[in-house]
């Protein structure tokens, strides 16, 4: 097997399963153990499978053979797909169908290809089914995209790695070859090197850009020289992050065939290597000033300008692309800011290296989940990269949450929400529906559950790069897709509805907000047949300091409320306030879908004027100078920007608050005083509690306050939640107001259960019932041993009710009823000894 010829083969159109066996499978695994499947058609004898297959767009599934890897059977299937769009949008049903056709406890190779157009890509998938039921969720699917227009470098390298081990192959070797994490680390390393190269070039005074981009307008008092320089150069780092983010976004977009579409051709017929080819085709002079001469104009005049009256045609000024179609995207990703307007110049080698590196990877727009992954760069990986590059993440105690944990927390919080006010006998059906997406399980509940899915209000108050809201977007989408008809036609509309009506997020770091918005935009693009103007997320995913709803000593949380009479304690909305609320609500809704620049600018001004007018009428006389009330790092107007959430009759607040808040941040004395005046748990109360100013404890109290009654809460936090006197305030809140609490705990030694975590962690789940705790479920401390698999750990968490066994600031971590019995005896003996004393 030759590497170059293999890559050429994988980059070609699909040539049939016989050809694939001869060119790939047999050279690696040999032919001696191969058992012919005689092209057995698996759909003919199973009508229920055929019905599911047709709904998924699958015409035929043939078992072409089986072989053994060690002692493990590995089946080989040829899958013919009748409609590409249906397969791309129906991953849930594909998973169900695969589980149905595979033998229990087995592995399989599957070749997916299209019967109606060989220009399209084809897919090689490795599946592993660990359970013994058709509906088990313990199955995984990993896919390489192959064929013309795909980067097959990773697939080639990994098949060659298997070939090198051909005499001693095991199933683990196959799973390692499909390891998305290995690809993620490789990509991040190369991406970070490119990022640092651009930053280092800009900060070098000899290259003439540093002085134009740095920020010197801040208080230097008490700062050392290296800290001053670092602070000055932050705008440069932010500029490079945004530049590279835009370029990576376009690599996702070009996979849709939406860039460089020839005049008169349809969307989807563009150049899938547009970014690299436009650089290659540029003149030497254009390459030497590629950013300002080519890319900046593409960003502003191409992607950020509506040219629908001209057939979306745009002149890139590069031969081969002088008169091509470029989509207008809206959304704000490519809007020019002050830094974009400054001259910037990089040697041609910088963009040559960056674009060549990016071209070696397959970019897959649909985000992977723990059980269904394309081996390539997906938006979730992009989120992880940007979160690792965010300013001071280590100092703020932030770490990226593994996707297995994201899915677990999203599903548990959604299940708790959907089970609210349901009969006990229906709750298990709801849980099974959320994990399997089988709507038949709901019976007569289907309409009620769908309405609750449409109405839910979700918030991550420390959104980072958007992992949890994106996770819940996926869960809501899959659940609604299982219930609602015509999912193929309605996929993009369902996602737009979810983003506009269900999801809210805030982060203090502007870069985090930018990447979170980018991921939501990509989630829409994956389901669009042709480009549509992206929504404006400025008032949905917002920058702000979640913990502060005050500025210069003034409380800004009551802007939408008016008190009647001193001491009456009754809140009403008078006619003027109703007008204010309606105007603000209408302007925000109009802004969300507005595609015109001038109109957007006017709407932003109108919105700011409405808020400032209300501040003035409330007697809040503060000079906000040039501060943007909707995007700053000083405070956040929860009850203003998200007033639609807090004004719902009998449901004032969010249904779900979820996240991975930072911990251990440092504050100045003024901020500490505000926190102590605002957060009950920040104060020590003699005989009751010891106060905590740790960031994560403040976020827990904030999250609790943001919830409506019976709202669901899910945070991942440091394990001191279960083992510190300073957490007694948090314990008083949740033990006094949450009927059922779940806490699972995870160690960092000998190796972190959650990669990149530097402290032991706990996942805290509860429902805000406003009644005392009846059940406090806890797990043992989970550690990472040999043959560790995070998904298996999460699927098999064992909770024990330890209510009544807590001590001041301490919650037991036990994993079995036997351990609980031992704890009971210890408590009894301690009580007897205390009485004797």
Where are these regions (language model features)?
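Preference for the N-terminal adenyl/adenosyl cofactor-binding alpha/beta module
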Residues: 2-99, 106-471, 475-477, 506-511, ...
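P-loop NTPase motor core
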Residues: 499-503, 511, 533, 537-560
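Flexible, glycine-/basic-rich loop-and-beta segments that form/coincide
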Residues: 755-834
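Short, surface-exposed amphipathic charged segments that create phosphate/polyanion-binding patches used
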Residues: 552-560, 754-763
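SAM-dependent methyltransferase catalytic-core segment centered on the flexible catalytic loop
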Residues: 458, 467-494, 549-593, 606-609, ...
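Short mixed-charge
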Residues: 422-449, 481-496, 525-535
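Conserved SAM-binding loop
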Residues: 516
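Adenylate-forming
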Residues: 702, 746-750, 780-782
């Amino acid at each position: 097997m030759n590497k170059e010829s293999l890559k050429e083969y994988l980059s070609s159109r699909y040539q049939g399963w016989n050809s694939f066996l001869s060119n790939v499978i047999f050279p690696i695994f040999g032919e001696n153990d191969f058992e012919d499947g005689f092209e057995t058609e698996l759909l003919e004898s199973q009508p229920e499978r055929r019905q599911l297959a047709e709904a998924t767009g699958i015409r035929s599934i043939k078992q072409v053979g089986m072989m053994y890897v060690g002692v493990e059977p590995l089946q080989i299937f040829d899958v013919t797909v009748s409609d590409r769009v249906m397969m791309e949008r129906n991953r849930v049903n594909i998973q169900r169908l695969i589980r149905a056709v595979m033998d229990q406890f087995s592995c399989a190779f599957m070749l997916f290809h299209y019967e109606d157009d060989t220009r399209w890509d084809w897919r090689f998938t490795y599946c592993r089914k660990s359970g013994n039921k058709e509906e088990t969720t313990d199955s995984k699917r990993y896919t390489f995209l192959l064929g013309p227009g795909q980067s097959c470098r990773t697939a080639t390298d990994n098949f060659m790695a298997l070939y090198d081990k051909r005499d001693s192959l095991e199933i683990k070797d196959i799973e390692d070859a499909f390891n998305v994490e290995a690809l993620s680390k490789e990509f991040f390393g190369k991406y970070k090197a490119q990022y640092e190269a651009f930053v280092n070039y800009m900060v070098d005074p000899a290259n003439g850009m540093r002085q134009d981009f740095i920020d010197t307008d801040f208080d230097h008092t008490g700062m050392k020289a290296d800290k001053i320089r670092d602070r000055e150069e932050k705008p440069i780092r932010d500029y490079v992050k945004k530049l590279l983010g835009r370029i990576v976004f376009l690599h996702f977009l070009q996979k849709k065939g939406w860039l460089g579409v020839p005049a008169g051709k349809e969307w989807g017929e563009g150049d899938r290597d547009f970014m690299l080819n436009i650089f290659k085709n540029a003149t030497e002079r254009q390459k030497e000033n590629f950013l300002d001469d080519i890319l900046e104009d593409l960003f502003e005049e191409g992607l950020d300008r509506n040219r629908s009256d001209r057939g979306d045609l745009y002149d890139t000024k590069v031969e081969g692309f002088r008169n091509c179609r470029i989509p207008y995207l809206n959304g704000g990703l490519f809007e020019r800011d002050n830094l974009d307007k400054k001259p910037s110049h990089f040697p041609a080698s910088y963009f040559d290296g960056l674009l060549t590196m990016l071209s070696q990877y397959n970019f897959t727009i649909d985000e992977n989940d723990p059980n269904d992954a394309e081996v390539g760069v997906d938006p979730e990986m992009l989120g992880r990269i940007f979160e690792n590059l965010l300013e001071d993440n280590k100092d703020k105690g932030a770490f990226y949450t593994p996707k297995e944990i994201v899915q677990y927390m999203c599903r548990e919080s959604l299940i708790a929400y959907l089970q609210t006010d349901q009969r006990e006998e229906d709750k298990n059906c709801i849980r099974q529906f959320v994990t399997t997406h089988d709507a038949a399980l709901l019976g007569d509940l289907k309409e009620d559950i769908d309405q609750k899915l449409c109405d839910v209000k979700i918030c991550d108050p420390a959104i980072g790069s958007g992992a949890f809201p994106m996770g819940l977007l996926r869960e809501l989408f899959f659940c609604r897709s299982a219930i609602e008809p015509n999912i193929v036609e309605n996929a993009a509309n369902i996602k737009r509805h979810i983003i506009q009506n269900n999801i809210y997020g805030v982060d203090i770091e502007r870069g985090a907000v930018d990447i979170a918005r980018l991921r939501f935009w990509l989630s829409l693009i994956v389901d669009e047949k042709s480009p549509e103007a992206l929504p404006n997320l400025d008032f949905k995913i917002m920058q702000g300091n979640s913990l502060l709803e005050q500025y210069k000593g003034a409380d800004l949380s009551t802007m939408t409320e008016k008190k009647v009479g001193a001491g009456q304690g009754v809140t009403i909305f008078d006619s003027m306030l109703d007008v204010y609320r309606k105007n603000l609500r209408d302007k925000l809704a109009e802004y969300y879908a507005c595609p015109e620049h001038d109109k957007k600018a006017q709407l932003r001004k109108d919105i700011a004027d409405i808020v400032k007018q209300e501040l003035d009428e409330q007697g809040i006389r503060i000079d906000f100078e040039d501060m943007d009330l909707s995007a700053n790092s000083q405070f956040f107007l929860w009850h203003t920007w998200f007033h639609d959430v807090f004004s719902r009759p009998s449901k004032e607040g969010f249904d779900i608050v979820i996240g991975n808040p930072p911990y251990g941040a440092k504050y100045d004395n003024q901020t500490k005083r505000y926190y102590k005046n605002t957060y009950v748990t920040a104060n020590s109360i003699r005989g009751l509690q010891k106060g905590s100013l740790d960031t994560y404890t403040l976020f827990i109290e904030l999250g609790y306050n943001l919830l409506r009654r019976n709202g669901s809460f899910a945070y991942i936090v440091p394990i001191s939640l279960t083992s510190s006197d300073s957490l007694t305030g948090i314990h008083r809140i949740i033990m006094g107001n949450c009927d059922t609490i779940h806490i699972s705990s995870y160690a960092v030694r000998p190796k972190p259960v959650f990669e990149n975590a530097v402290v032991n962690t706990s996942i805290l789940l509860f429902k805000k019932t406003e009644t005392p705790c009846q059940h406090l479920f806890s797990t043992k401390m989970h550690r990472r041993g040999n043959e560790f698999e995070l998904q298996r750990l999460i699927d098999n968490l064992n909770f024990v009710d330890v209510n009544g066994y807590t001590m001041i600031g301490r919650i037991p971590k036990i994993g079995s009823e036997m351990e609980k019995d031992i704890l009971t005896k210890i408590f009894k003996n301690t009580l007897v000894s205390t009485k004797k004393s």
